[in-house]
């Protein structure tokens, strides 16, 4: 045990080891509070005194929630050497987190965003104080749990740090080689002398490598044999990186370098975040310091990402989930554009559904006023045009080979890899289940909306039939009036046109039968047992009640226990006979559990999901055809209504002229009577006939006026009840 005046620690209770110091877990003598005690070794004292004091001076200047706090500088009781009393971080480092099998293919998106936020926050504080860290890596980013239960990451280990302004440079070498800037790598690792000086932006390269590692679980630049076994190829990769690339991997010995500007498919970050993050990585992973972004642009771009809100969207036809990263002050117009970038559905074809109802976003509506969404409760987007069904895109990863040879180091590495694959399969199984549940929900809601559209079309068709019937009766009565006018030799040029309109109205009336038949066909397809019913969605695929994810998790828990035991075995370096036999049995169990898990994943999760995907594609194709048919019928009803309205308007104009024509008819009879003296009987008959004709015409005009009044009242009553938004079909 060692101690200072206020703290003590056991030499066996070590937290970490570095080139110049060890860190122990210690306690305050009076309170018992835990602290991290940094004790410098003999190598550290070989450094110049000013270099030894530099870490103390740097830490004294820093005070930020994302920097490990320095509480005191004390002296060890026996040696009188300086020790640092620092904040204790019980959850280890980011490296510890990335070593977990569950993070073998990168952190979950929510955790990655916390890393991004905290590292950027810590680095910004360093820059404000004119300090360059020079050894940014996952092992130097500590983790604690905050009061809200979320992770908080803090920069630590400022042994390599020094004060340096943006326009200053340095020539000394520090850092960990996988995370080193290419210019520093050349001198520090390859031992090649050059006259280059390094600026503060060398930290940006290390940050880029760290962020890529956190996002994917792997280093971005990897020779076939590994970064430390083939340093020349490693240097070739990091100096030869094309502009825009964020990774370079050699997949075969002496093989070519595979460059990529995108994250690997196995990465758990959403596409919405990746499109924002990859340009940042591409521009800070830049060997040429002239082309590399400066800190100002780096902070501006990362701040832009961190200040965005997320709107969850699910594309029903494509069966894909999306996260739309958008500023709270952005409008619905920008939201539709961002949806297009991820789904390729143009804005005019995007129909939105939220919690079973159509969601209409006014163009100027701000994103902060959108409905609240989650992965389980997103906004559904449906395209009015055909789309290819895509589904979840994931990497099909096979189990690594298990070598029968007994090897503690190799077995620990193998256990980590094989457990990581099953963790990945478990995550994919959970996502596949979520996608199927969202499809079931979306299909159910869409069917209800189509039924609403169908009912509105039926309602509109009923309106049209009533209007058409009134119009036909009106035109028939108008024809009778004009025919009577013709009987007294009064010219009625409109009669031919009226008869033509009557014929057209009868033709329109006969077309109602075809529309009715089509509507009945649609109704039968939407009814239970019809081709568009959703019964299949509850029969196909996987369901929560199957508990497939839970079954995989049970096997994964067994594997994880074996993995942790293998880590302990590796630390022991050598096992007694009995422990060695247990180790060998566990190795067999590990492979058995892994094989069983992957078989279950393939047979029960993947195959059933693919069957569901195929059925979904077939249903969506039928649904789109039905909606187009329904839209066509609706448009036919509106077209008929418009045509009938035009004929009715013309008829009304004719009716307005009838009183004048009747007056003309009465006058014309008087003037056209022959001057001879007819018999008294003839005069009486003519007078009675004219009186009767006049009464009939007046009766027809009155009836026509009443019909028009009824039509007007009917129109006003149904105006609010008709289809308002036909484009929604």
Curated annotation (Swiss-Prot):
It comes from the Eukaryota. Changing residue 470 to E: Abolishes dimerization and decreases kinase activity but no effect on phosphorylation. Changing residue 711 to A: Almost abolishes interaction with TANK. Changing residue 152 to L: No effect on IFNB induction. Changing residue 306 to I: In FTDALS4; uncertain significance. Residues 621-729 are annotated as: Interaction with AZI2, TANK and TBKBP1. One of its GO terms (cellular component) is intracellular membrane-bounded organelle. Autophosphorylation at Ser-172 activates the kinase, and is an essential step for virus-triggered signaling. Phosphorylated by IKBKB/IKKB at Ser-172. Phosphorylation requires homodimerization and ubiquitination at Lys-30 and Lys-401. Dephosphorylated at Ser-172 by PPM1B and this negatively regulates its role in mediating antiviral response. 'Lys-63'-linked polyubiquitination by MIB1 after RNA virus infection, or by NRDP1 after LPS stimulation at Lys-30 and Lys-401, participates in kinase activation. 'Lys-48'-linked polyubiquitination at Lys-670 by DTX4 leads to proteasomal degradation. 'Lys-48'-linked polyubiquitination by TRAIP also leads to proteasomal degradation. 'Lys-48'-linked polyubiquitination by TRAF7; leading to proteasomal degradation. 'Lys-63'-linked polyubiquitination by RNF128 at Lys-30 and Lys-401 leads to the activation of antiviral responses. It is an enzyme of class 2 (transferase). One of its GO terms (biological process) is positive regulation of interferon-beta production. Keywords: Amyotrophic lateral sclerosis, Antiviral defense, ATP-binding, Coiled coil, Cytoplasm, Disease variant, Glaucoma, Host-virus interaction, Immunity, Innate immunity, Isopeptide bond, Kinase, Methylation, Neurodegeneration, Nucleotide-binding, Phosphoprotein, Serine/threonine-protein kinase, Transferase, Ubl conjugation. Changing residue 388 to S: No effect on IFNB induction. Changing residue 533 to T: No effect on IFNB induction. The active site is at residue 135. The modification N6-methyllysine is found at residue 607. GO terms for molecular function: ATP binding; identical protein binding; nucleic acid binding; phosphoprotein binding; protein kinase activity; protein phosphatase binding; protein serine kinase activity; protein serine/threonine kinase activity. Changing residue 659 to S: No effect on IFNB induction. It holds the Pfam family TBK1_ULD. Belongs to the protein kinase superfamily. Ser/Thr protein kinase family. I-kappa-B kinase subfamily. It is linked to Glaucoma 1, open angle, P: A form of primary open angle glaucoma (POAG). POAG is characterized by a specific pattern of optic nerve and visual field defects. The angle of the anterior chamber of the eye is open, and usually the intraocular pressure is increased. However, glaucoma can occur at any intraocular pressure. The disease is generally asymptomatic until the late stages, by which time significant and irreversible optic nerve damage has already taken place. GLC1P is characterized by early onset, thin central corneas and low intraocular pressure. Serine/threonine kinase that plays an essential role in regulating inflammatory responses to foreign agents. Following activation of toll-like receptors by viral or bacterial components, associates with TRAF3 and TANK and phosphorylates interferon regulatory factors (IRFs) IRF3 and IRF7 as well as DDX3X. This activity allows subsequent homodimerization and nuclear translocation of the IRFs leading to transcriptional activation of pro-inflammatory and antiviral genes including IFNA and IFNB. In cancer cells, pathological TBK1 activation promotes oncogenic transformation by suppressing programmed cell death. Mechanistically, the RALB-SEC5/EXOC2-TBK1 signaling cascade seems to participate in both innate immune signaling and cell transformation. Additionally, TBK1 supports oncogenesis by directly phosphorylating and activating AKT1 at the exocyst. Comprises A N-terminal kinase domain, a ubiquitin-like domain and a C-terminal coiled-coil region mediating homodimerization. This is Serine/threonine-protein kinase TBK1. It comes from Homo sapiens.
């Amino acid at each position: 045990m060692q101690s200072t005046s206020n703290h003590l620690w056991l030499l066996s209770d070590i937290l970490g080891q570095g080139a110049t110091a060890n860190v122990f877990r210690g306690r305050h003598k009076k309170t018992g509070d835990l602290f991290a005690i940094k004790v410098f070794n003999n190598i550290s004292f070989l450094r110049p005194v000013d270099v030894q004091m530099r870490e103390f001076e740097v830490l004294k200047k820093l005070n930020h929630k994302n920097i490990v706090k320095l509480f005191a500088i004390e002296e060890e009781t026996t040696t009188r050497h300086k020790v640092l009393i620092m904040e204790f971080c019980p959850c280890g480092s980011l490296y510890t987190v990335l070593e977990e099998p569950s993070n073998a293919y990168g952190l979950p998106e929510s955790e990655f965003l916390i890393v991004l936020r905290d590292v950027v926050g810590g680095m910004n504080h360093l820059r404000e104080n004119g300090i360059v860290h020079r050894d940014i890596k996952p092992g130097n980013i500590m983790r604690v749990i905050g009061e809200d239960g979320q992770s908080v990451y803090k920069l630590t280990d400022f042994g390599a740090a020094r004060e340096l302004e943006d326009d200053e440079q340095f020539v000394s070498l520090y850092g960990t080689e996988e995370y080193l800037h290419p210019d520093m790598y050349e001198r520090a690792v390859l031992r090649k002398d050059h006259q280059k000086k390094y600026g503060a932006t060398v930290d940006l390269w290390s940050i880029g490598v760290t962020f890529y590692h956190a996002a994917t679980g792997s280093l971005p630049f990897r020779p076939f044999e590994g970064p430390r076994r083939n340093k020349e190829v490693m240097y070739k990769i990091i100096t030869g990186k094309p502009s825009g690339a964020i990774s370079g991997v050699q997949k075969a010995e002496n093989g070519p370098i595979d460059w990529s500007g995108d994250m690997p498919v196995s990465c758990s970050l959403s596409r919405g975040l990746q499109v924002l993050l990859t340009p940042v990585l591409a521009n800070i992973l830049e060997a040429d310091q002239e082309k590399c972004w400066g800190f100002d642009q780096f902070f501006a771009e990362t701040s832009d990402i961190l200040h965005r809100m997320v709107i969850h969207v699910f594309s029903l036809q494509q069966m894909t989930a999306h996260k739309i990263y958008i500023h709270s002050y952005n409008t619905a117009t920008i939201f539709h554009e961002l949806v297009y970038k991820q789904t390729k559905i143009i804005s005019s074809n995007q129909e939105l559904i939220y919690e079973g109802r159509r969601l209409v976003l006014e163009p100027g509506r701000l994103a902060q006023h959108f409905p609240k969404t989650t992965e389980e409760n997103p906004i559904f987007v449906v395209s009015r045009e055909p789309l290819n069904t895509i589904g979840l895109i994931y990497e099909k990863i096979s189990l690594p080979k298990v070598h029968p040879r007994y090897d503690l180091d190799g077995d620990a590495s193998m256990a980590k890899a094989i457990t990581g694959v099953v963790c990945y399969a478990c995550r994919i199984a959970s996502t596949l289940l979520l996608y199927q549940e969202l499809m079931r929900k979306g299909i159910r809601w869409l069917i209800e909306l189509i039924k609403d559209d169908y009912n509105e079309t039926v309602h509109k068709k009923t309106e049209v039939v009533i209007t058409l019937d009134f119009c036909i009766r009106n035109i028939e009565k108008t024809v009778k009036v004009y025919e009577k006018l013709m009987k007294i030799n009064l010219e009625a040029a409109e009669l031919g046109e009226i008869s033509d309109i009557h014929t057209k109205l009868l033709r329109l009336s006969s077309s109602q039968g075809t529309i009715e038949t089509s509507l009945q066909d649609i109704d039968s397809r939407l009814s239970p047992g019809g081709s568009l019913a959703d019964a299949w969605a509850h029969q196909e695929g996987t369901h929560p009640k199957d508990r497939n994810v839970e079954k995989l998790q049970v096997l994964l828990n067994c594997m994880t226990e074996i993995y942790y035991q293998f880590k302990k075995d590796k630390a022991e370096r050598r096992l007694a006979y009995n422990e060695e036999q247990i180790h060998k049995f566990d190795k067999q169990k590990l492979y058995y559990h892994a094989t069983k898990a992957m078989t279950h994943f393939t047979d029960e999760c993947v195959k059933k999901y693919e069957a569901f995907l195929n059925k979904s594609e077939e249903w969506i194709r039928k649904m789109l055809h039905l909606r187009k048919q329904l839209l066509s019928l609706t448009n036919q009803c509106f077209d008929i209504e418009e045509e009938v309205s035009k004929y009715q308007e013309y008829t009304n104009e004719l009716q307005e002229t009838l009183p004048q024509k009747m007056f003309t008819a009465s006058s014309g009879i008087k003037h056209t009577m022959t001057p001879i003296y007819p018999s008294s009987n003839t005069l009486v008959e003519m007078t009675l006939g004219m009186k009767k004709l006049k009464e009939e015409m007046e009766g027809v005009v009155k009836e026509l006026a009443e019909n028009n009044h009824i039509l007007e009242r009917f129109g006003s009553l149904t105006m609010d009840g008709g289809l308002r938004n036909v484009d929604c079909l």
